[in-house]
């Protein structure tokens, strides 16, 4: 293809390495995204799911929000330099900025990372 192909997983993993070599994934699936594993390798130290959260709908209530905050703090306490959100649905809720304020470590929004990498690719191709 002549157009750049950019995905949220690879973009977020690449950005995470800018902030440290101990990356934790926070999402709603048992496994970290394949591109997180591929790019981060041994730098991916843990993948976590907030208790009681099975979809982004569960995040909209107080119980889901509290669970996400608790899991983010757990990851920080496990030694994370950075938390990479592994769910684009979390991104649409603006969770990254809020979790970053709570944990005081970088929390990466996969949609923002994807957009940033795409922007760079478009600039590079049009220069």
Labelled PLM ranges:
Residues 1-127:
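Non-catalytic structural scaffold of enzyme domains
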């Amino acid at each position: 293809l002549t157009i750049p192909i950019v995905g949220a997983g690879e973009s977020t993993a690449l950005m995470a390495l800018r902030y440290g070599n101990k990356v934790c994934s926070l999402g709603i699936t048992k496994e970290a995204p394949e591109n997180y594993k591929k790019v981060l390798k041994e730098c991916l130290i843990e993948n976590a799911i907030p208790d009681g959260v099975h979809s982004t709908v569960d995040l909209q209530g107080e119980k889901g929000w509290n669970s996400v905050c608790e899991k983010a703090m757990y990851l920080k306490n496990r030694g994370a330099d950075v938390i990479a959100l592994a769910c684009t649905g979390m991104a649409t809720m603006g969770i990254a900025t809020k979790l970053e304020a709570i944990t005081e470590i970088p929390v990466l929004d996969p949609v923002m990372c994807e957009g940033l990498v795409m922007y760079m690719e478009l600039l590079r191709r049009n220069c």
